[in-house]
From Swiss-Prot:
Glycans are attached at residue 482. Keywords: Cell membrane, Glycoprotein, Membrane, Phosphoprotein, Sugar transport, Transmembrane, Transmembrane helix, Transport. PROSITE patterns: MFS (PS50850), SUGAR_TRANSPORT_1 (PS00216), SUGAR_TRANSPORT_2 (PS00217). It comes from Drosophila virilis. Belongs to the major facilitator superfamily. Sugar transporter (TC 2.A.1.1) family. Trehalose transporter subfamily. Residues 468-494, 549-551, 600-606, 712-727, 776-794, 843-855 are extracellular. This is Facilitated trehalose transporter Tret1. The gene is Tret1. The lineage of its organism: Eukaryota, Metazoa, Ecdysozoa, Arthropoda, Hexapoda. The chain crosses the membrane at residues 447-467, 495-515, 528-548, 552-572, 579-599, 607-627, 691-711, 728-748, 755-775, 795-815, 822-842, 856-876.
């Protein structure tokens, strides 16, 4: 696209010529103007126009103003002094000398008009000097600009017609002369290409003023430069016409200089932007092609995948290091080739951004011109897509390599790897290389080490069951003055039965911090010796105070054990056998209750206490053989010990790394969600609902009267006047409780939690109201000898119903519905609340019998169970077959990761 092809039809606008011709010389236009002025009798006005054009160095041809190329830019122009190039930069003395020379020339024009007219017509066509020079210098030459990338269509040709307007004589006289002034409008920032193609010829004084307003809109100021003032002689001239000629000539020079100066600056910016865009396009093509070739060569030459990744990473580093120097080097070349005024470019914000280069880049960069050759659009897109795919693969591989190095570093140093877990978790969530996660199988895996750990914990549960059932057979012989050396009043007897739940409350509160700081195994192990001491205090008691001290110490250990035993078992046993082995503590606890009832038939309270002191001995020995839980080791940052504990529990041939990493991720989530004050965390609205459900289930479990029935079984049967021996009745109740444990384990995952709670409530309500009716008839004097079997039957059904629902389910749902971040503190609160209710029931049961009779106490327990039925219907959710994430989403409205939460099996004897 050449400048000659885009010249347009502006040359024939005023004279009626067709478009597309070359611009006519100024002499032809002046000739036509002379003819019109001569016919109008204004020959003198023509000479004034001609003299002003000569004085202002306008030139002889419009081609000097609009050269061949529509985008003029100086090419290899000699560098001129700023004062010569821009008149407004000259000193006042130089300007005064220049104006004096112009005045002298104007005075000689009247004498040399014929010669000037002839010289004007014969003068050859010359290129216009952009700015007026006092010295003779070679004219500026022009070259075509680089085509802009975004100019794909031929520019629109703008026809600017010459406006020739013949002014009236009055206007001619007022202006002093008629001037032809070439004023191409400066290009605006919005449409630079269109502005460079516009051409116009301004005629007359009115068009001159209009051009001034246009230039003012283009940010060109017509204010006088500092130091420039009209000569005093011209201001004081008496000749008005001469003064007007001088003023208009001076303004013409200034307007022409400012106009071309603005055009030059805009053209320099346009050229720099054009070259920059072309270079960037070539740079991207070169980068993609070089990257694709290099990666293909790597795939062929690499002997292994690791070597390929290493070489590719080195290439990526070299590519990014060379990118900035290459761009900076090329842009410097472009700016040097298109810049003629470094001072003005330094002030421009856009050029400052382009010229900027990092300080640390000092070495030269060699650019291969062959690599900068452009290819077709299809090849360019294909190469870029291939390169982007390879780069994405490289990035993923680097992340995988980094993750592998982090794991290896943790294995060698043995430090706490939890600091790296957030990074690992983020990589996993983003869909990047995932770590192997332990997934339980459906087939049960029985390993003798896990069975040994379950048996050791279950022996501690047997001790707890024996201590819970001790008061039922022991109070019968303890209140007998023939068998006891001290007197035990009914009030003291109630304290013997009720002080253990009160101590269990304190133990439940203290058990939470103990298992966190001492460890699960150490906390359980620490209860063995206090158990033995408590039983010896009871066995050797010489007064009621020693018995109460022994019961309080035993109750404190029971409270700690009831919290720590299920936690240890849940954290050591695999999920595949957790249900089966989790049954052992409940079964051994019921065995302890049955053993206490059977031994109490043949032993007094002192001998029974010596038997209780012997039970913790095997429990103590076995606890020394088992390790601490791996989860507690992970929480303390002891990764190597956690690995050894897993190897002991899972077997030497088992791969424990996936499970160990899962424990570390779960612990990291718990640490991130933990707060400094966990008790305040319980009071949040989102945590109150699950906590209130757990506390409600504990409340209805204990207010059903189960502990009162267990503690006072023999006394109840004696008061009922049953034909069956009281000790035999307690044995029967213990056997039923033991058998109901297996039935509940089978049905709890098949029928559902709420269904078993419904059945349990109905059975307990019916039996409690029937027992209340039996005692009411007996207290009324009615003969009940014919129904002596009724109390035993009601007790059996009552124990069976309790063991099916309200015995195990409150403990089970405590581990299901409590949020992960508050499970420890919330479980401690629930356990303490359970023992508080147990203390209230056992301590006040004897007082309730004295106050409202046995029938009133059983009817009150039945009414509470009936209310608990509606609590279960409207408030307790069903958790059967749901993951912990689904349960928490329903309870709190959000999901958290709970990948390894122990399925805690309750101790049904802890009632």
């Amino acid at each position: 696209m050449s400048g000659r092809d885009n010249r347009g039809a502006g040359g024939g606008g005023g004279g009626g010529g067709g478009g597309g011709h070359h611009h006519q010389p100024l002499s032809s236009a002046m000739g036509k103007l002379k003819e019109k002025l001569t016919r109008a009798g204004e020959e003198l006005g023509y000479h004034r126009v001609e003299s002003n054009l000569s004085t202002s160095n306008t030139g002889t041809s419009l081609d000097t103003i609009l050269p061949e190329d529509p985008f003029p830019f100086p090419q290899a122009a000699p560098q001129r002094h700023p004062q010569q190039q821009f008149p407004h930069l000259q000193s006042p003395q130089q300007q005064r000398q220049q104006l004096q020379q112009q005045q002298l020339q104007q005075q000689q024009l009247h004498l040399q008009q014929p010669q000037q007219q002839l010289q004007q017509q014969q003068q050859p066509q010359q290129q216009l000097r952009l700015l007026h020079d006092v010295d003779d210098e070679p004219p500026l030459s022009f070259r075509p600009l680089l085509e802009d990338v975004d100019i794909n269509e031929p520019p629109q040709q703008i026809h600017v017609q010459q406006q020739q307007q013949q002014l009236p004589r009055t206007a001619l006289r007022a202006s002093g002369s008629l001037e032809l002034t070439p004023l191409p409008p400066p290009p605006t920032s919005l449409e630079p290409h269109r502005d460079r193609q516009q051409r116009s010829i301004v005629t007359g004084g009115e068009e001159l003023q209009r051009s001034k307003q246009s230039l003012k809109g283009s940010r060109v100021s017509f204010e006088k430069p500092r130091g420039e003032q009209l000569p005093a002689k011209a201001a004081e001239s008496s000749d008005e016409d001469s003064f007007e000629d001088k003023r208009i000539g001076f303004q013409q020079q200034k307007a022409t200089s400012v106009d071309h100066k603005g055009i030059l600056k805009d053209l320099k910016h346009i050229l720099a932007n054009d070259n920059r865009r072309q270079f960037q396009a070539k740079k991207h093509v070169s980068l993609d092609i070089k990257g694709t070739r290099f990666l293909k060569d790597l795939l062929k030459d690499s002997s292994s995948e690791e070597e390929f990744h290493k070489t590719r990473r080195e290439f990526q580093g070299r590519k990014h290091q060379s990118l900035d120097p290459r761009v900076t080097f090329k842009l410097d070349k472009v700016l040097q080739g298109s810049s003629t005024d470094s001072d003005e470019e330094g002030d421009d914000a856009e050029h400052k951004r382009l010229i900027h280069r990092p300080k640390d880049i000092t070495k030269p960069v060699i650019i291969d011109l062959k690599d900068l050759e452009s290819e077709s659009d299809e090849d360019f897109l294909t190469s870029r897509q291939n390169f982007q795919q390879q780069r994405s693969i490289s990035t993923d591989s680097r992340k995988s390599r980094r993750l592998y190095e982090m794991d290896e570093m943790g294995n060698k140093r043995g430090d706490n790897i939890r600091h790296a877990v957030p990074f690992v978790r983020q990589i996993t969530e983003d869909g990047k290389p995932k770590l192997e996660v332990y997934r339980p199988t459906t087939n049960p895996i029985y390993i003798w080490t896990q069975v040994l750990a379950a048996l050791s914990v279950s022996l501690g549960s047997l001790v707890v069951g024996f201590a819970s059932a001790y008061t039922s057979p022991a109070l019968v012989s303890m209140t007998n003055t023939n068998l006891t050396s001290f007197v035990v009043t009914p009030q003291a007897a109630s304290w013997v039965g009720g002080i253990m739940p009160l101590a269990g409350l304190a133990g439940g509160i203290a058990g939470g911090p103990f298992i966190e700081y001492l460890g699960r195994r150490n906390t359980i192990l620490a209860t063995a010796v206090p158990f033995i001491v408590s039983w010896l205090l009871i066995a050797c008691a010489v007064n009621v105070i020693m018995v109460l001290c022994g019961r309080f110490l035993a109750g404190f250990c029971v409270g700690i054990a009831s919290l720590s035993l299920p936690v240890y078992l849940g954290e050591t046993v695999q999920p595949e056998v957790r249900g089966t082995l989790g049954l052992l503590p409940t079964a051994f606890g019921n065995i302890g209750i049955l053993l206490c009832f059977v031994a109490g038939t043949y032993m007094d309270w002192s001998m029974l206490a010596f038997l209780g002191a012997s039970l913790p001995v095997p429990f103590l020995i076995l606890m020394f053989l088992i390790p601490e839980t791996p989860r507690w080791y992970v929480s303390r940052g002891r990764e190597e010990r956690a690995r050894k504990a897993l190897v002991w529990l899972r077997g030497k041939e088992a791969d424990v790394e996936p499970e160990l990493k899962g424990l570390m991720r779960s612990q990291a989530d718990a640490d991130r969600q933990a707060t400094q004050n966990k008790m305040l965390e319980l009071l949040k609205r989102s945590n109150l609902k699950p906590l209130s459900i757990s506390l409600g289930l504990m409340f209805f479990q204990q207010l059903s009267g189960i502990n009162a029935v267990i503690f006072y079984t023999v006394q109840i049967f004696q008061d009922a006047g049953s034909t069956i021996d009281g000790n035999v009745c307690t044995i029967i109740v213990g056997v039923v409780n033991f058998a109901a444990t297996f039935i509940a384990t089978i049905l709890i995952d098949r029928a559902g939690r709420k269904v078993l709670l419904y059945v349990s409530n109905v059975m307990m309500v019916l039996t409690l109201f029937v027992l209340g009716g039996f005692f009411y008839c007996k207290s009324s004097g009615m003969d009940t000898s014919n129904v002596g079997w009724l109390p035993l039957s009601c007790f059996v059904i009552y124990i069976l119903g309790f063991s099916l629902g309200f015995g195990p389910i409150p403990w089970l749902m405590m581990g299901e519905i409590l949020p992960a971040k508050i499970r420890g503190s919330a479980a401690s609160v629930a356990t303490a609340f359970n023992w508080s209710c147990t203390f209230v029931v056992t301590k006040s049961f004897q007082d309730m019998i004295d106050f409202m009779g046995a029938h009133g106490a059983f009817w009150m327990f039945g009414a509470i169970c009936f209310i608990g039925l509606f609590f279960v219907i409207f408030y307790v959710p069903e958790t059967q077959g749901k993951t912990l994430e689904d349960i928490e989403r329903k309870m709190m409205g959000r999901v958290r990761r709970m990948s390894s939460v122990a399925n805690i099996k309750p101790l049904s004897f802890n009632m």
